[in-house]
Amino acid sequence: MSIENAFRLPSPLPQWPPGTGFGGGTIDLGGLLVSQVSTFTKIWAAQEGGPDGMGATFFEPSAVPDGFHVLGHYGQPNNAPLFGWVLVAKDVTNGGRAALQTPVDYTLVWSSENAKIKQDGAVYIWAPVPSDGYKPVGHVVTASPQKPPLDKIRCVRVDFTDVSETEDWIWGTNGLNVYSSRPKNRGTKDSGVSTGTFLAGDSVPSCLKNLNTPNPSSMPNLPQIKSLLQTYSPWIYFHPDEEFLPSSVPWFFKNGALLYTKGQESSPAPIEQTGANLPQGGNSDGAYWLDLPTNDADKDRVKKGNLQDCTCYVHVKPMLGATFTDIALWMFYPFNGPARAKVEFLTIKLGKIGEHVGDWEHVTLRISNFNGELKRVYFSEHSRGMWVSASQVEFQNGNKPVVYSSLHGHAAYPAPGLVLQGSKVIGIRNDTEKGNTVMDTGASFSIVSAEYLGSVVTEPPWLNYAREWGPKINYDIAKELKKVERFMPGKLKAELEKVVRSLPNEVLGEEGPTGPKWKDSWSGDERS
């Protein structure tokens, strides 16, 4: 689908349970009331350049609510359906210096008059010139060389602004690149707010700032969180050849997982089902670690996990100045299987490389606090991952995203197929396929943390275990590679070793991972 088609979620949104501000259509940033507008009037389009060479289209927000003002226009690549939004704002300061002000002038950022591109006539991109004490948070796009009217847009009082940065590339041609924007600081306690507008050329408009954080009345309460999970909980498909499935944490503990203490390796301790006897807090200092049962039969059984006794663990957090809710859904796998490499036309098993005990993977749903609409899904892929617009996600049973878990490594992907870490000739395989083994995360989830709700959600003891969920394994990479390199042409041996050694230790299997709470995404944005 192209931008000519507007994207809508497959099913209408439900009526959310009552609360203080979530889903109410507007959010008060502390004297600046903002609303999310997703209806647009097309201004101009290019038919080439940008992602996939398909061009980009620029829009003016329309159907702006009474009393609200435009802060900037919207741009999007043409290689996806129209699924955008911008914030519009209303001054509710009740006296004092106004939160919004018209610009005093415009400067021309770029014109396509002399650009030799396929385009709908000429376009002019303008930067507002603010009066003292105000900043622009967006650009204006026109099809006329005349400057826009001064009341076309509003600049924002400086204390309602924060530092922004570029995010995704929208479009570019000689002398100009256009990007979407986001706040530079994006932790759970940061107050920067995305405006939905774009950045063009060298000018970097600010983003907004929520002066009401850290009191996020716009965030969902517990009944609303449960309703969001009923609406958007993903389906996870496992590869038909997957041997190592997820389980619940209590199942792992009660089936023989052991707690080891440095210096007392000969006497590991069984673990209580809630993890009550695990050391709490601290850091990853090698003093403690978990491992599989010592009995070989039990070890092999626990490695395989138990999908019938599996729970998805949910962490809910405010993002982008509490204008969005991130719902991270964490899956625990007792064991991560061995890696495989693609070498030209061959698939080669890499021995013990990639094996490790205790594998935590997650998917994150980014939901608008204005209306409860799912906007993006984050697919974690080992130490990094990628955000995917809801318009590019596969859905099943209404508005539930489909996730594909890679064979042995359990990385999450939005579509089936092969993704290589490395080059097209040689790399580590991440294979996904829609097998018959599938998990409905909405059928078995546990909300383990929502810090902004205070004592409403009680965190289980295992969540505050800061050490590794598997032992550190020191195996000889060169020795493991030597076992497989005899099948390879000589020129590719060094290249394979380079790819393998570039993998992070958690992926290599040299050390067990820490739990969800000790990832930097727990209190920050996802890595992408």
Language-model regions: role of each:
Residues 161-217:
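Long terminal segments
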Residues 12, 16-19, 26, 203-359, ...:
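A domain-level signal for the mature, folded cores of soluble proteins
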Residues 68-76, 85, 101-105, 137-140:
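Short, surface-exposed polybasic-aromatic patches that bind anionic ligands, especially phosphate groups
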Residues 56-57, 123-124, 325-327, 361-363, ...:
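Residue-level detector of short, conserved catalytic/binding motifs and their immediate flanks
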Residues 366-370:
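Short beta-strand micro-motifs enriched in acidic
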Residues 38-44, 48-53, 67, 308-310, ...:
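Eukaryotic beta-rich interaction modules
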Residues 11-58, 88-123, 152-177:
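Short, flexible domain-boundary/linker segments around small modular repeats
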Residues 63, 68-71, 118-149:
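Amphipathic alpha-helical packing elements
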